């Protein structure tokens, strides 16, 4: 019972129209088929009357044949018109759906715009920009500090490597340099030669002083 009093939607109306148009197309096709059969029968009757020499009957049948062919031509025109109406109905339905979608979208946008505060939105964007700038500055400062730490650490390691290399070379070259050192810096050549293979820390300090290295 509720369906009887329910208001039809646009889709319901269009569906009914399309159903009626399809029924019309089928009826036109049936009429055309009947006219084609009648056309063939008249052609056969005209040939039959022509063979018997009945000219008057041929004229009457020929007029009927002309009317049948005209009516068959009209069925093609009507069928084309019905097809055009069906296509137009589908296009209108599509346009109405698009309009409905646009109306719904417009309502949604209006509701969103009512709830949105332009001032608060602008303030939020500005705060976001400020905080982003602070983060960038903090990150840059941290990177600079880390770079300085690692650079200092590298210099210290490089300096230590040089000191180690010099100390390693002292043990190898000290015997050659002692040959040119003043005689007061060593007791006897034989004693220096005897200690060349095993030099103590005190010997290294004396030898450095003798070479003029503090």
Swiss-Prot record:
Probable core component of the endosomal sorting required for transport complex III (ESCRT-III) which is involved in multivesicular bodies (MVBs) formation and sorting of endosomal cargo proteins into MVBs. MVBs contain intraluminal vesicles (ILVs) that are generated by invagination and scission from the limiting membrane of the endosome and mostly are delivered to lysosomes enabling degradation of membrane proteins, such as stimulated growth factor receptors, lysosomal enzymes and lipids. It comes from the Eukaryota. It is a peripheral membrane protein. Residues 25-55 form a coiled coil. Disulfide bonds: none annotated. One of its GO terms (cellular component) is ESCRT III complex. InterPro entries: Snf7_fam. This is Charged multivesicular body protein 2b. It holds the Pfam family Snf7. GO terms for biological process: endosome transport via multivesicular body sorting pathway; late endosome to vacuole transport; protein transport. Belongs to the SNF7 family. A motif (MIT-interacting motif) lies at residues 202-212. PANTHER family: CHARGED MULTIVESICULAR BODY PROTEIN. Residues 178-199 are annotated as: Disordered. It is found in: Cytoplasm, Cytosol; Late endosome membrane. Keywords: Coiled coil, Cytoplasm, Endosome, Membrane, Protein transport, Transport.
